[in-house]
Each structure stands twice: as C-alpha cells, then as structure tokens.
Amino acid sequence: MSKENIFVTKPTLPPLNDLIPYLEKIWETRVLTNGGEFHQKFEAALCDYFGVHHICLFTNATIALVTALQALRITGEVITTPYSFVATSHALLWNGIKPVFVDIDPHSLNLDPARIESAITPHTTAIMPVHCYGHPCDVNGIQRIADNYNLKIIYDAAHAFGVQDAGGSILRYGDLSVLSFHATKVFNTFEGGAIICPDEKTKVRIDQLKNFGHVGETTVVAPGINGKMSEFNAALGLLQLQHIDSALACRQKIDEAYRLKLAGIPGISCIQGSGECVANYAYFPILVHEDYFLTRDTLYNLMKEKGIHPRRYFYPLISQFPMYRGLSSAHPDNLPVALDISQKILCLPIYPDLEMSVVDVICQLIANPC
C-alpha cells in the first residue's frame, strides 16, 4: 500500500486529451452557457441512457431541488428523511417549507412508508424521499400513500445514477427525480445536477425557472434563479457517459471484494441492496455494532491515523442541526432507527481505481484493529 491518503472517494475523470476537442469547440463557438450545443446533446444523451423522455440540466443538485419544489408549487409541510445530506432539507427551507421528519427503515435506510401516514397533516403537500446510497425506496408503498392523500413526490436521487429495478430506471418514479453530478458522485460533471420530468409542460416550466423565470427576452413569469449548466460541464458530461459503464463495473468488483473479506467479522455488517436489479455501487456502508472490538468512532479515528479516510454518512442526522432540532418531528424519540444507524454507520473508500491491495489493507485493519 502506498503512503498516500486513501479517501472515501476519488473523482472519476476521462483522459485529458479526449476533452481537448470539446474545449476547442467551445472556444470556436464562444457559446459558454444558455443551452448551447453541448447542453442540448447532453440532455438528449441522458434521456437515452436512462430511458426517459424529459430532463433538465442544472448547475448543481441543490439548486435543482430548490427549483423542483418551486416548479410543483409545493408549500406548507413536506415529509422527508432525517438521514441524508443536509441539502435535502435545506431545499425545503429555501422555499419556506417546513420539513417533517419521519424515521427510516432499518434495512434499506430509506424513508419508512409505515411511518409516513401518521405524519400527514392538513398542511402536508408532498413527500421528499431519498434513495439512500443508491438503494431504491419502497416506491410503490410511497406512491400509494401519496395517491390516497393527493400528495406530490419529489425523489432526491442524488445517489441513484444508473440504478434500475425490474422495470427500468428508478428515476421514472414520483412527480420529479433530482440527480447530482457532483465531483463525489459515481457520475460527475465537476458540479452539476438534473431533474427528470414527466412531460414537456413540466420541463418547459423548470427550464423557465432555472433561467430567472424568463420567457423570451422581455417577459418574466416567475421569480426564478440562475440554475443553468454551462457548456463546459455539459461537454464533460457527454465525455463521461462514454466511460460510466466501465467505472460502475470496477465499483462492483470492489463492492464484491469488501463483502467477501468482511464476512464473518464479529460486530460488522454490510448494508444490503433494496431490490435494485442494476446497482451503481456508489457507497460501501457498513454498520459497526456494539459487539465489535471498538466503537464506531474509535475505528473511524484509527483508520484516519493509518491514512484511510472513511466517512460517517450520515452523522449527525439533519434533524440534529440547529436550524432543524427545534421541530417537533426532530425529537430523537420520533427517529429511533435513524439515530441508531447514524451512530453505527461507516462508509468505506470505493472508487473505480481503488487498488485491491488497499481493499485488503482496509479489511485487515477492520478485522484486526488492536
């Protein structure tokens, strides 16, 4: 094992020389943003890759979440998970919406449909679940509840690039799904995001909202924002699509190696999938139970001392941050599963060029930490 630090992820990039022709085209046309040629081609390529009909590109997924809520005119209260990156709930606050936290399923770590109905009030207008670690939510269970109460569903699918169930991409569920192309994701455009739309009318509204609310040169129909993806990011995305399948295949091998080598270690369990037919292996989360040799945080610090940098995704819970902890739904008694998982979770390094020898060292350290 080399002396360099091993982080939880490393951005996947194409060969630099392959990017040069794209840059030359941008320099030639001087079209840098506002829906240029690469933007249009990237949208079309993603629609083809996912098997969907409409997609809107964004500068990042947080702005996409904010805009998705605005596009569907969501107000009042939205039921969501406390077990996610904080941007999920921040998008609600940016829209003046009250998050209502519901506990997670102990196996999938996604929003637990059995707990949603009791959290619905006359002010509830939507549900915002997260496909945590790229493992699909109980989409049918959530949809039944939404249909019964006339609620919208916006999926935070930041982790779910390329994930499929038996019917195809999981991005087809809900009213909208939001993707992240951040540098830490399995597919990146440096920064970026997207909204998968159900129809042309919704796409047009979202495209207007991400362009300040403009319709033409002289008409503004809504207080929109600048959420447009640049031509550079779109060009990079087009190139990245050529390499994504091989990158996911590499991730799968690392995932399989971890599962094999960690099997049988007392107090360590690996998170399983939740029904996906095609996974993306975006994360490798383990749970450090009470019968392990060390506490989770002691193991975490020991690994960092050895130059290995796992992450505690997601600790602390969103509901424990100052802007949320005053909500009645944020009380720990309301979220026992999420709280328990957050104190046991540890995400191990995984990225396409992670050497198997490093995986061996990580697993040996977990097996024999003392």
Per-range role (PLM):
Residues 179-180, 193-199, 238:
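Short beta-strand-to-turn element immediately C-terminal to the catalytic PLP-Schiff-base lysine
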Residues 31, 35-77, 83, 91-94, ...:
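Phosphate-binding glycine-rich loop
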Residues 70-157, 164:
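PLP-dependent aminotransferase-like
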Residues 84, 107-108, 134, 185, ...:
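Glycine-/small-residue-rich active-site loops that bind phosphorylated ligands and cofactors
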Residues 155-189, 204, 216-221:
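Conserved active-site segment immediately N-terminal to the catalytic lysine
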Residues 37-45, 49-53, 114, 118, ...:
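PLP-dependent aminotransferase class I/II
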Residues 1-32:
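N-terminal "arm"/small-domain region of PLP-dependent enzymes with the aminotransferase-like
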